[in-house]
A protein has these predicted regions:
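Signature of N6-adenine DNA methyltransferases within the class I
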Residues: 1-145
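Polybasic, glycine- and aromatic-enriched phosphate-binding surface used to engage nucleic acids
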Residues: 133-286
Length: 286
């Protein structure tokens, strides 16, 4: 199906949404999946890999999980030549209940058979198609769903400068429980007017995590600083929760890094930390 968000065609979008279960997305391919499942016994489509994990497709995954998803092929970026988009293929048997799912990966060059219920376990916010024993060992030691995620969408280079009143932290400034100073990279602003991110200024219980990386590391937000969109700002989902530097240092370990790669389904493009993926930045139990 076409991969396109309908933004200007309001009337057409309302027609599509009138029949859709998932009205949280404007992307046509989601409507194609639903209609195909209504009229077909066996449905197989190549769609963006974001179907697996993005919050806007939560309801689409719910629908699919109730049927038998017999195959998932992860093409990574190899689906279409010269097109830098990650894609997957799935086969859904709409008149059969879940059983086993065959996962074929162009990334790992392996074929693995797992119980569908294991890969689509509802205790996680989305499907984990590379889930394995190593992933489970780390997951069993962690308490999840500790944070909410925020990302600035306003601050650009044109708004920042080399010196100023308030420091604007960017992804490379974030180290393991430390802020890294980088000459000619560090940024500042003088005026926070109109910047929504200013609400976090001097709130020291906020946690900073770089976006778009398989090299996770975290630190607390220092006073006198904010962060641009290359950094996720995490706040506690429950204010009674206590997060320590030891909790944050776990994110920089090899064990968590490998766990996190599986949690992100070995994706390469859509690695922004959203309110689904932030789930996995938990804290160690006890």
């Amino acid at each position: 199906p076409p991969y396109k968000k309908l933004t200007k065609e309001k009337e057409l979008l309302s027609v599509y949404k009138a029949e859709a279960y998932n009205t949280d997305t404007n992307n046509i391919f989601s409507f194609f999946i639903e209609k195909s499942m209504r009229i077909g016994k066996v449905v197989s489509l190549i769609v963006p890999k974001s179907l697996i994990n993005a919050p806007e497709f939560n309801k689409t995954r719910q629908l699919m999980s109730k049927k038998r998803v017999s195959h998932i092929i992860d093409f990574g970026e190899k689906g279409f030549k010269k097109v830098k988009i990650e894609t997957i293929n799935f086969v859904v048997e709409t008149q059969r209940k879940s059983a086993q799912t065959i996962v074929e990966s162009y990334i790992t060059e392996k074929v693995v058979v797992q119980q569908q219920s294991y890969l689509m376990d509802t205790k996680f916010p989305y499907w984990i198609i590379y889930r394995n024993e190593d992933f489970d060992k780390v997951a069993d030691k962690m308490e999840f769903n500790v944070f909410k995620a925020y990302r600035d969408r306003v601050i650009t280079k044109s708004l920042t400068k080399g010196k100023g009143q308030v420091r604007v932290l960017k992804s490379r400034n974030i180290g393991d429980n430390q802020i890294i100073d980088i000459p000619e990279y560090d940024s500042y602003v003088d005026n926070l007017d109109g910047l929504d991110v200013s609400k976090f200024l001097n709130k020291t219980n906020c946690v900073l995590l770089p976006n778009l990386t398989y090299n996770p590391r975290a630190c607390f937000l220092p006073k006198g600083c904010i962060a641009d969109g290359s950094v996720a700002i995490l706040t506690l989902a429950n204010n009674d929760e206590v997060i320590t530097k030891e909790d944050l240092s776990f994110y920089a370990t090899d064990k968590f890094t490998k766990f996190y790669a599986i949690a992100r389904n070995l994706g390469t493009r859509s690695l922004n930390i959203d309110n689904n993926s932030v789930f996995f930045f938990g804290k160690l139990k006890g």
